[in-house]
Amino acid sequence: MSLKQIVGHKLLNDVIRPLKKGDGRSAWNVLIVDTLAMRMLSSCCKMHNIMEEGITIVEDLNKRREPLPTLEAIYLIAPTAESIDKLIQDYCARNLYKCAHVFFTEACSDQLFSTLSKSAAARFIKTLKEINIAFTPYESQVFNLDSPDTFFLYYNAQKQGGLTSNLERIAEQIATVCATLGEYPSLRYRADFERNVELGHLVEQKLDAYKADDPSMGEGADKARSQLIIIDRGYDAITPLLHELTLQAMCYDLLGIENDVYKYETGGSDENLEKEVLLDENDDLWVEMRHKHIAVVSQEVTKNLKKFSESKGNKGTMDSKSIKDLSMLIKRMPQHKKELNKFSTHISLAEECMKQYQQGVDKLCKVEQDLSTGIDAEGERVRDAMKLMVPLLIDPAVRCEDRLRLILLYILSKNGITDENLNKLLQHANISMADKETITNAAYLGLNIVTDTGRKKTWTPTKKERPHEQVYQSSRWVPVIKDIIEDAIDERLDTKHFPFLAGRQVNQGYRAPASARYGQWHKERGQQSNYRSGPRLIIYIIGGVTFSEMRACYEVTAARKPWEVVIGSDRIITPDKFLTNLRDLNKPRDI
């Protein structure tokens, strides 16, 4: 089962289904969720599945709700002071619901547990459990902690006021990812950024607590080989800056997709309708195409459309015009409207991406690839990077953000430049001194940016030759994470730069003491049957994971069975989001 399937299975089987009461009006329950639980639910379960299990309405804990005193309420919430206060208020003056079944997404602190136990709401609570899913399964191998403040707290030394509580929180969330997957992994971290070891120890403590509550966690074939690697964003600042030409990364970079919703116009010549489509794994064509290079996506979608059309008895030839506008085909085959609309979406995605590519992204890609790899398309070493860059820096048609991306790539390729040279570059590129901070703030990530004196050498794994992988001239850069993952699987990852936490290199027959406080709240016996055998590599990047890095994990998983690579972060980032994070890094921020 994939990460998404495991979470969906747990939500239905451990939270919703046990409280279903049969048929009739009294059988219905209300489901109350906080923001994270709503995202988790939306990611894994369809509304009709939830309703089939007796849920009549899903409500937001933080919004005003109408009383439904004849119905029982299921609360799926994080055990925070705010959430518990809202829960208590529901049973104060008048009861909003008949009784409460409370499921915390993670471990509840003693203090909050005591507050709830002593409240007036306590006598209405019929169920109180921890399900240990404090993350959103974004894709089958990707998780999101949805913690946008982490980047600012972790990388800016002046904002450490909220850092301790944030690290505690994300450590708990990371531990719930491992617990959900049934893993008790060895723990490694990137040593070149000092704070990583602190987070590593916090995660270790949380994992040990989960292991104490469920000794079967991490048992099974090859599970002793599973690893969790904690990495800071400074390990590879090049990947978040590049224009990537595989479909998913390109769409999110260029097409302004928000909350995974793609908007486009469709229809015949007389009418234009705006459509909204959710890009997720429920669309099998999206899953098939998302990691493919844009050069082949259009051809493959067209080929698949033609094959589908002919398999349904439509033998007419399809010229380019009818592919561009599928409305006539939909009229001829109305019973297949749903499938044809999928093709329409993907043709539109590919066309929009290609249009942007041809309108200037192609020139950016060439220079970006030369800067990032240090080698040009002919395999020659790049000798004058400035000469490549300047025509784009002075071109008014190139967006300010794209010029910033180029300058940062140039600086990283040089391992830092002088302040004088940076100011000259900014002047060339017509970039304001206010935007200069976007560049200089990258130093907070441990990168050499402005270096008037000595430069520290940054270690990266040796780049591999990849003779069997198809390489496009405009996509020669391979995300550093791919080399790290492959080296970790092959037991070749440098232990000086990626050390194991003491005592966590090999898990052999570990048996933690039973939890005195929680007993066996955390897991029901027999749950392990849902977990896959074989080792997992779990990657956590502090400060955002890119779509290119997500793709690398799927590629390695496909090539290195029985290993499965799962990757996650506090948020999913695009190049523009990465620049915004850098720009705001030293600004006052309410946490």
Curated annotation (Swiss-Prot):
Which PANTHER family does the entry link to? VESICLE PROTEIN SORTING-ASSOCIATED (PTHR11679)
According to its UniProt entry, this protein's organism is Caenorhabditis elegans
Residues bearing Phosphothreonine?
462
| GO cellular component terms given for this protein | axon; cytosol; plasma membrane; presynapse; secretory granule
Compartments, record wording: Cytoplasm, Cytosol; Cell membrane; Cell projection, Axon
| Record note on quaternary structure | Monomer. Interacts with unc-64 (via N-terminus, in open or in closed conformation); the interaction is direct. Competes with tom-1 for binding to unc-64. Interaction with unc-64 via the N-terminus mediates the secretion of the neurotransmitter acetylcholine from cholinergic motor neurons. Interaction with unc-64 in open conformation promotes synaptic vesicle docking and tethering. When phosphorylated by pkc-2, interaction in closed conformation with unc-64 is reduced. Interaction with unc-64 is reduced in the presence of unc-13.
Q: What does this protein do?
A: Mediates vesicle exocytosis, protein trafficking and neurotransmission. Associates with SNARE protein unc-64 and thereby promotes the anterograde transport of unc-64 out of the endoplasmic reticulum and out of neuronal cell bodies. Plays a role in synaptic vesicle docking and tethering through its association with unc-64. Competes with SNARE protein tom-1 for binding to unc-64. Through association with unc-64, mediates the release of the neurotransmitter acetylcholine from cholinergic motor neurons, and thereby promotes locomotory behaviors.
UniProt cross-references to Gene3D superfamilies, sorted A to Z: 1.25.40.60, 3.40.50.1910, 3.40.50.2060, Syntaxin Binding Protein 1, Chain A, domain 2
Q: Which residues carry this modification: Phosphoserine?
A: 2, 322, 515
Q: What is this protein called?
A: Acetylcholine regulator unc-18
Record's keyword terms, sorted: Cell membrane, Cell projection, Cytoplasm, Membrane, Phosphoprotein, Protein transport, Transport
Q: Which GO terms describe its biological process?
A: intracellular protein transport; positive regulation of neurotransmitter secretion; presynaptic dense core vesicle exocytosis; synaptic transmission, cholinergic; synaptic vesicle docking; vesicle docking involved in exocytosis
Modification note: Phosphorylation on Ser-322 by pkc-2 reduces closed conformation interaction with unc-64. Not phosphorylated on Ser-322 by pkc-1.
Reported effect of changing residue 133 to V? In md1401; uncoordinated with slow growth rate. Reduces locomotion. Accumulation of the neurotransmitter acetylcholine. Resistant to acetylcholine esterase inhibitor trichlorfon. Resistant to sedatory and stimulatory effects of ethanol
What tissues is it present in?
Motor neurons and a limited number of neurons constituting nerve ganglia. Expressed in hermaphrodite specific neurons and AVE, SIBD and SIBV interneurons. Expressed in body wall muscles. Expressed in cholinergic motor neurons. Expressed in the AFD thermosensory neuron.
Impact upon substituting residue 549 to K = In b403; uncoordinated with slow growth rate. Defects in synaptic vesicle docking and tethering. Accumulation of the neurotransmitter acetylcholine. Resistant to acetylcholine esterase inhibitor trichlorfon
Q: How does it sit in the membrane?
A: Peripheral membrane protein
Is Cytoplasm one of the keywords UniProt gives this record? Answer: yes
Q: Which GO terms describe its molecular function?
A: syntaxin binding
* Range of residues in the leader sequence: none
Q: Would you identify the family this protein belongs to, as annotated?
A: Belongs to the STXBP/unc-18/SEC1 family.
